[in-house]
UniProtKB/Swiss-Prot annotation:
This is Light-independent protochlorophyllide reductase subunit B. Keywords: 4Fe-4S, ATP-binding, Bacteriochlorophyll biosynthesis, Chlorophyll biosynthesis, Iron, Iron-sulfur, Metal-binding, Nucleotide-binding, Oxidoreductase, Photosynthesis. Component of the dark-operative protochlorophyllide reductase (DPOR) that uses Mg-ATP and reduced ferredoxin to reduce ring D of protochlorophyllide (Pchlide) to form chlorophyllide a (Chlide). This reaction is light-independent. The NB-protein (BchN-BchB) is the catalytic component of the complex. Pfam families: Oxidored_nitro, PCP_red. NCBIfam families: DPOR_BchB (TIGR01278). Pathway: Porphyrin-containing compound metabolism; bacteriochlorophyll biosynthesis (light-independent). Binds 1 [4Fe-4S] cluster per heterodimer. The cluster is bound at the heterodimer interface by residues from both subunits. It comes from Rhodobacter capsulatus (strain ATCC BAA-309 / NBRC 16581 / SB1003). Residues 433-464 are annotated as: Disordered. The active site is at 274 (proton donor). It is an enzyme of class 1 (oxidoreductase). Its EC number is 1.3.7.7. One of its GO terms (molecular function) is oxidoreductase activity, acting on the CH-CH group of donors, iron-sulfur protein as acceptor.
Length: 525
């Protein structure tokens, strides 16, 4: 156990809540002390759901610790069934309740309720949230789904979408459209939007689409064994992956590949004149394994970025992520410590970060552009608009999402480049009002360690980092710093790094304007 101000994943019972909240007519009963979890806040504030999550609590207190707390769980189960009348129920223990070793399986059986009650085994001290969601969904599918006759037409199940998932709602809609172009209907989408009665119909489909391995792979593997349903292995995030996904579906079903790329813009836009701003941009990627692997492929092969670092916080995806990282000559970072992630980002010196809400905070601290690609996320990443990550429309959304932080418009570049101009500095006023511009008095450049931090409105100018060499330390002269700030900030970091490398190679301690332009000429060859 450790004290931290950020965690990428909650305990396993949070994953159970995500599955229960995604479904209809299912009630989850959590056995735990008062204040041990916070279901309402997660789903009504962050995801902005218009209904409270279907979660009930036994809520024992300190005064109950010397008594039989199992009675409280028994009463909570009976009360939840009487009040909500669900089609099925699930029961789980929170972290603290696990220490008491109450038996939810035996208690639920003794009640003899008229609906299925699925006990969940969620080891709170060795596993985390994604495992909890995956195991909860698997347990529900195992308890309710049975083999049955297939539908006359080719159908599939969509597996893995949950509450609090990153763009899961829109991904389901986009994948449904993709499959419809091949004449394939969706039999059941689960857990998102499904009821326990819907889970009983899972066996009717011809195959399963595994949308999110983190939360649906165990259920997909169970259905493969129990109902003889194959499942897809490719996640359709990005243009190439979407085409590969449709080819995989064609191989499973025997249907011809039919695609509608009439609305796809990402490939052309990536190859357009603006691609000169994109090609070679250094990018660091961190998040859940599925989204990181997909993002690395898009960044390297579809947009033209250089992937300089990648990692994930969920250890269940460590093996496939290490395999993917090796393709780019990288060693994968597998950690759930945000401080380690921050150190890795600083060491990699990227020009763009793709990550979670935590990486957005790290990017603000370091003055780097960032785009969110993976849960956990905050309220702004649950948009009211349609914004999928999967399919061809998802590729368009990803292109916009990644490029916008780089500030493609020339306005900001020009404002930064001419910040010191006599007509455009802050004290001159608006030039289009006909004011009389007066040249501002030059002030000496503050030392690197005393320079004020960049505001949120002004892109951070990279303060000269002192690099210690055998011959002494490298310093930026004031006139060189001023010249560096005239370089558009979307390439300023690269120019700064190249200049310092050139100076170190030449044994130059003081970087002047001449050094800056010599380095530019050297690396332009």
């Amino acid at each position: 156990m450790k004290l931290t101000l950020w965690t990428y994943e909650g305990p396993p019972h949070v994953g159970a809540m995500r599955v229960a909240t995604a479904m209809k007519d299912l009630q989850l009963v959590l056995h735990g002390p008062q204040g041990d979890t916070y279901a309402d806040l997660l789903f009504t504030m962050i995801e902005r759901r218009n209904a409270r999550p279907p979660v009930s609590f036994s809520t024992f207190e300190a005064s109950h610790m010397g008594t039989d707390t199992a009675i409280l769980l028994k009463d909570a189960l009976a009360a939840a069934h009487a009040r909500y009348k669900p089609q099925a129920m699930a029961v789980a223990l929170t972290c603290t309740a696990e220490l008491l070793q109450d038996d939810p399986n035996g208690i639920s059986r003794a009640l003899n309720l008229p609906v299925p009650v699925v006990p969940l085994e969620l080891p709170s001290y060795s596993r985390k949230e994604n495992y909890g969601a995956d195991e909860t969904f698997r347990a529900l599918v195992r308890a309710l789904a049975v083999p049955m006759e297939r539908t006359p037409e080719v159908t599939c199940n969509l597996l893995g979408a949950t509450a609090l998932g990153f763009r899961h709602r829109d991904d389901v809609a986009e994948v449904t459209k993709l499959l419809a172009t091949m004449g394939i209907k969706v039999n059941v989408c689960a857990p998102l939007g499904a009821s326990p009665d819907d889970l009983r119909k899972l066996g009717q489909a011809h195959f399963n689409v595994l949308m999110y391995p983190e939360t649906g792979e165990s259920a997909a593997r169970h259905l493969e064994r129990a109902c003889k349903q194959p499942f897809t292995k490719i996640v359709p995030i990005g243009v190439g992956a979407t085409r590969d996904f449709l080819a995989e579906v064609s191989k499973i079903t025997g249907l011809p590949v039919v695609t509608d790329e009439s609305t796809l813009r990402q490939p052309w836009w990536s190859a357009s004149v603006d691609s000169t701003y994109l090609t070679g941009k250094r990018v660091f990627i961190f998040g859940d394994g599925t989204h990181v692997i997909a993002a690395a492929r898009i960044a390297a092969k579809e947009v033209g970025f250089e992937v300089v670092g990648m990692g994930c916080y969920n250890r269940e995806m460590a093996r496939p992520l290490r395999t993917a990282a090796a393709e780019y000559g990288l060693e994968a970072l597998i950690t759930d410590d945000y401080l380690e992630v921050e150190k890795a980002i600083e060491a990699a010196a990227p020009e763009l970060i793709l990550g979670t809400q935590m990486e957005r905070n790290i990017a603000k601290k370091l003055g780097l552009p960032c785009a969110v690609i993976s849960a956990p996320v905050h309220v702004q990443d649950f948009p009211a608009r349609y914004a999928p990550q999967m399919g061809f429309e998802g590729a368009n959304v990803l292109f916009d999402t990644w490029v916008h932080p780089l500030v493609m418009g020339l306005e900001e570049h020009l404002l930064t480049m001419f910040r010191e101009d006599f007509e455009f500095h802050d004290a001159a006023g608006a030039s289009h009002h006909g004011g009389k511009a007066v040249a501002r008095e030059e002030s000496p450049v503050a030392p690197a360690d005393l320079a004020p931090a960049a505001t949120s409105d002004t892109p951070a100018a990279p303060s000269p980092v002192v690099v210690t060499q055998a011959s002494g330390e490298i310093r930026w002269m004031p006139e060189a710093e001023r010249e560096l700030r005239k370089i558009p900030f979307f390439v300023r970091g690269k120019a700064k790094r190249n200049t310092e490398l050139y100076a170190a190679h030449k044994g130059v301690c003081d970087i002047t304007v001449e050094t800056l332009y010599e380095a530019k000429a050297h690396y332009a060859r």
